Amino acid sequence: MQPPVQFLPRNRPAFGGYDAPFTDFLYFHLMGEPLCHPQLERFLELAGEAGFRVILTTNGTLLSRMQEVLLAAPALHKVNISLQAFEGSGMAMDFDTYLAGCFGFGQAAAGKKIVCYRLWNRGGLDSCNPAILRGLEGHFPQPWVQERRGI
């Protein structure tokens, strides 16, 4: 026997009412760009009110536009920026402008939020990797923590 299907009311976020003993974090990512959501700022507020910390994964294209909202959100704990997304998705944006926005966000977030730059394209589209790595070194001199196991 299967439990009955239930739907949440339209005005209630899916994480409302969950209890902290089950998890401390909410992850905003997967199957879409969370920075595109028109209610992102409100979701961050609600997450904080419920006692959650948010980890957000983005392709980075909207970081410049959303920087103020993200940095002002107490619930936002960490931002993962998938730098490989630029080459893999054919974004209609200048590459240098894209990198400047991603790296500028990281510099503005220093000491306030955790920022993780991801470059997960080994064996795929990776011709931009040398330029990305040079840009990272220019903005964030080494040593870095490099994690190659996908953790």
Model-predicted segments: where are they?
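Conserved glycine-rich "GG(E/T)P / GGGxP" loop and the immediately following alpha-helix
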Residues: 1-148
